[in-house]
Amino acid sequence: MLRVAVPNKGTLAEKAAQMLREAGYRQRTDPKDLVCRDDANNIEFFYLRPKDIATYVGSGDLDVGITGRDLLVDSGAPATEVVDLGFGQATFRFAARPEDIDTAQDLDGRRVATAYPGLVERHLAELGVKADVIRLDGAVENAIRLGLADVVADVVETGATLRQAGLVVFGEPLLRSSAVLVCRSAAQPHPQGELLLRRLHSVLVARRYVMLTYDVPADLLARASSLTPGIESPTVSRLHREGWVAVQAMVLRDDVHRIMDELYQVGARAILVTNIQACRL
């Protein structure tokens, strides 16, 4: 049975559970449950603190897990990113008082407060910068005001919290993070693990694409199908109406309205969009 670590709370937890449901797996119904068995799919889910997941997977106690890339790097665990799951995006940045520090090279000899000491120390080592990294569990923005640190390093989404504390970001991002599936670095392939990966890929494709169908005169098919080439090729069927065909093709969700506009200008009609629940390419 495949043993999978899943975040037990927060935005990663909600979106990870939703993705697993879309992939056809049973998930817990009570947020207090720590384990959920899906015997039909020969898989067992363990709900853990996101920060601990890479450690459990890296030790081999669990086979795979879903966590943030930032948490994976910070853990230093012997675990490897398998696939980016496309949610939980965040950027990890340095911040300080305005005009105090301009670049990461200016951190030499400074005090840096963060909840991600492993990530920060690794980044500074790559830059050849020596700084005093101070570990905090949260609310690092106050560390500068209270005199504990000169700089903070934290996940930044909008930057509003930093601005409220009178801080500004500087330098290049340390890391661009998102939710990822991880496995033990030296792990042997697991049949159920490979199936889980295929199913997650299926959900990712379904979220990225939609199915577009339309009717078009046969003499305009070449122009219309050039807008909708599909993955391999569009599906074309003759209609009862003489000289017309129906076309079906997958298109990128982000492009669908532009493509619909262009198809209509070409002469296509009855243009419909259908969401894809799952897809194997």
From Swiss-Prot:
Keyword Glycosyltransferase in record: yes
GO biological process, one term: L-histidine biosynthetic process
Organism: Salinispora tropica (strain ATCC BAA-916 / DSM 44818 / JCM 13857 / NBRC 105044 / CNB-440)
Similarity field: Belongs to the ATP phosphoribosyltransferase family. Long subfamily.
Gene Ontology CC: cytoplasm
GO molecular function: ATP binding; ATP phosphoribosyltransferase activity; magnesium ion binding
Function, in words: Catalyzes the condensation of ATP and 5-phosphoribose 1-diphosphate to form N'-(5'-phosphoribosyl)-ATP (PR-ATP). Has a crucial role in the pathway because the rate of histidine biosynthesis seems to be controlled primarily by regulation of HisG enzymatic activity.
Subcellular location: Cytoplasm
SUPFAM superfamilies (alphabetical): GlnB-like, Periplasmic binding protein-like II
Primary location class: cytoplasm
Pfam family, one: HisG
Keyword set, alphabetical order: Amino-acid biosynthesis, ATP-binding, Cytoplasm, Glycosyltransferase, Histidine biosynthesis, Magnesium, Metal-binding, Nucleotide-binding, Transferase
Regulation of its activity: Feedback inhibited by histidine.
Known pathway: Amino-acid biosynthesis; L-histidine biosynthesis; L-histidine from 5-phospho-alpha-D-ribose 1-diphosphate: step 1/9
NCBIfam families, per the entry: hisG, HisG_C-term
The protein, known as: ATP phosphoribosyltransferase
Cofactor entry: Mg(2+)
Catalytic activity: 1-(5-phospho-beta-D-ribosyl)-ATP + diphosphate = 5-phospho-alpha-D-ribose 1-diphosphate + ATP
